[in-house]
Amino acid sequence: MLPFATIPATERNSAAQHQDPSPMSQPFDLPALASSLADKSPQDILKAAFEHFGDELWISFSGAEDVVLVDMAWKLNRNVKVFSLDTGRLHPETYRFIDQVREHYGIAIDVLSPDPRLLEPLVKEKGLFSFYRDGHGECCGIRKIEPLKRKLAGVRAWATGQRRDQSPGTRSQVAVLEIDGAFSTPEKPLYKFNPLSSMTSEEVWGYIRMLELPYNSLHERGYISIGCEPCTRPVLPNQHEREGRWWWEEATHKECGLHAGNLISKA
């Protein structure tokens, strides 16, 4: 089982008080660092990320189980920077949960929104549910990928809550550290940390319950993988969590594009 022991309060306070808030961006050997972190705890991976990037590291929060990532990062750096995507189609419970997390940790969450100049023509021409007919790619491209691309254009490193057990078809090879193949450019590499990659759903929920973290109330109604309201449904017993997303499409295509590298690497 992956170690994710709780950091004692005295150590958490010390880490928070001594965290250097200035950007560090220290050069490093990517393969060597990735290899050294491969078997480390999520906290150790995040600590290394902060050591190399300081406040240039952004945490991605989806409004679901990745509250664990926010919690771990906040305990290492109280000045942690967090962003979340508001597609305009999230569940009411998710909006409430994002507010809960903001208040619980006393942090600002940078909420990213779609560009209305792109969104309005799509809705006007195809309506609000074109993804059931045309696939989710176009809608996700406007509501998720474009806002994220705008955000990451000014970011040197980010951390996600991706886990290998979330999708055997697309996430089974998620590395703890990689160059983001979807959003890097030749001039500007983007470093992507996945500290929770080796954690299982059971371990994530053990952490949430042990520390009594806030969580999305949709989880109490059978939702596991939570996205936009029209594209998410509860899963049945013995179904994989990803079967609750875009259920009308092939399993191998169940990535919205935020982690397109998972698909690119399999091409």
From Swiss-Prot:
Keywords: Cytoplasm, Disulfide bond, Iron, Iron-sulfur, Metal-binding, Oxidoreductase. Adenosine 5'-phosphosulfate binds at S60, L85, K144, G161, R242, E243, G244, R245. Pathway: Sulfur metabolism; hydrogen sulfide biosynthesis; sulfite from sulfate. CDD domains: PAPS_reductase. GO terms for biological process: cysteine biosynthetic process; hydrogen sulfide biosynthetic process; sulfate assimilation; sulfate assimilation, phosphoadenylyl sulfate reduction by phosphoadenylyl-sulfate reductase (thioredoxin). Disruption phenotype: Cysteine auxotrophy. Its main location: cytoplasm. [4Fe-4S] cluster binds at C139, C140, C228, C231. NCBIfam families: APS_reductase, cysH, PRK02090.1. Catalyzes the formation of sulfite from adenosine 5'-phosphosulfate (APS) using thioredoxin as an electron donor. This is Adenosine 5'-phosphosulfate reductase. The lineage of its organism: Bacteria, Pseudomonadati, Pseudomonadota, Gammaproteobacteria, Pseudomonadales. The gene is cysH.
